[in-house]
């Protein structure tokens, strides 16, 4: 009876689908790939803080130009607020001529007004993430910006730590950060402006505060004022109109 049951089980077992791989091989592969990326991008041409739409778009464009680009993101996922258009609703909009970026990435959209275009946020952000990866951009997610590396009056890199460290009590998380260096840092962290605020704390940049919402005026500022706010540090996104240099 026992032999018959065993034969029945064997007969019902389907053909093998997946290749053989030991658990330790998987662990080594993950650890090695992470180490290789960190070793290669610890010194990059450009480091971008924030993997929202601004950071992802900039990283793709710069990588296609031949620069070695690293993006850090404090969340486990990439895309920032691009997943949602507002008030927890996921359609997102752009005004002409910004839809040309959607054309370039193959993102479908529809016209909903005079010069106003709409697409599902998940579709747009997934295409943009894929395009950045295809261009050669590397990412460190769950990585939190802590401070700037400064040399001779110029931003030369950033100081980072694991994001979960900041969520634990300090008395049990004596975990030192590490430094990453680059020729240029781009702060694409959104309204937090984490890198710029480190300069404000040291009175190297003046901060006039955030203006009330005005889409047309704010988006024009993004285009016209994106640039260096301090040697080695470029600021992007809507907060570009907020800081000024005192020198």
Model regions and ranges:
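Feature captures the FAD/FMN-dependent oxidoreductase FAD-binding
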Residues: 108-184
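Flavin (primarily FAD) binding-site architecture
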Residues: 187-202
């Amino acid at each position: 009876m026992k032999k018959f049951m065993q034969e029945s089980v064997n007969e019902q077992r389907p053909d093998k689908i997946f290749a053989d791989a030991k658990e330790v091989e998987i662990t080594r592969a993950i650890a090695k790939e992470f180490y290789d990326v960190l070793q290669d991008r610890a010194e990059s041409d450009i480091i971008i803080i924030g993997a929202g739409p601004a950071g992802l778009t900039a990283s793709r464009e710069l990588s296609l130009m031949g620069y070695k680009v690293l993006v850090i993101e404090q969340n486990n996922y990439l895309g920032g607020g691009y997943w949602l258009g507002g008030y927890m609703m996921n359609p997102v909009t752009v005004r002409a001529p910004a839809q040309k970026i959607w054309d370039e990435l193959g993102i479908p959209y529809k016209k909903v007004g005079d010069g106003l275009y709409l697409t599902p946020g998940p579709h747009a952000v997934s295409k943009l993430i894929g395009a950045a990866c295809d261009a050669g951009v590397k990412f460190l997610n769950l990585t939190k910006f802590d401070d700037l590396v400064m040399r001779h009056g110029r931003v030369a890199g950033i100081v980072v730590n694991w994001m979960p460290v900041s969520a634990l009590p300090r008395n049990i998380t004596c975990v030192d950060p590490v430094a990453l260096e680059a020729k240029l840092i781009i702060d694409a962290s959104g309204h937090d402006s984490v890198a710029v605020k480190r300069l404000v704390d040291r009175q190297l940049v003046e901060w006039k505060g955030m203006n009330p919402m005005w889409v047309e005026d704010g988006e024009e500022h993004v285009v016209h004022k994106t640039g260096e706010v301090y040697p080695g540090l470029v600021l992007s996104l809507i907060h570009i109109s907020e800081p000024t240099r005192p020198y």
